[in-house]
């Protein structure tokens, strides 16, 4: 299962687009402040560093989008636990 695009929202929800065309809304608030995810406490960091690395939802730690210097979430976790939604970008015109 591979992630191809992400769209973070300021409520710690992220729209996660998968290669099979499904879109899942996944809330990461349960991770914020815990271990490696403590950086997500900073909402600006959370939004501005949210990206796709290693085929999944990730946050670059150095701004260089290095696949080894990031925090990420297993795409299967997102796929199984996220809520399937319609593309939120369809409604923006």
Where are these regions (language model features)?
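Motif-centric detector for short Cys/His coordination patterns
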Residues: 1-93
């Amino acid at each position: 299962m591979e992630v191809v695009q992400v769209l973070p929202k300021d409520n710690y929800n992220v729209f996660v687009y998968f290669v099979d065309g499904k879109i899942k809304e996944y809330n990461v608030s349960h991770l914020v402040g815990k271990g490696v995810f403590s950086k997500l406490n900073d909402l600006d960091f959370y939004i501005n560093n949210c990206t796709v690395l290693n085929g999944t939802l990730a946050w670059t730690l150095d701004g260089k989008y290095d696949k080894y210097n990031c925090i990420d979430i297993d795409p299967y976790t997102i796929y199984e636990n996220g809520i399937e939604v319609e593309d939120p970008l369809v409604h923006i015109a």
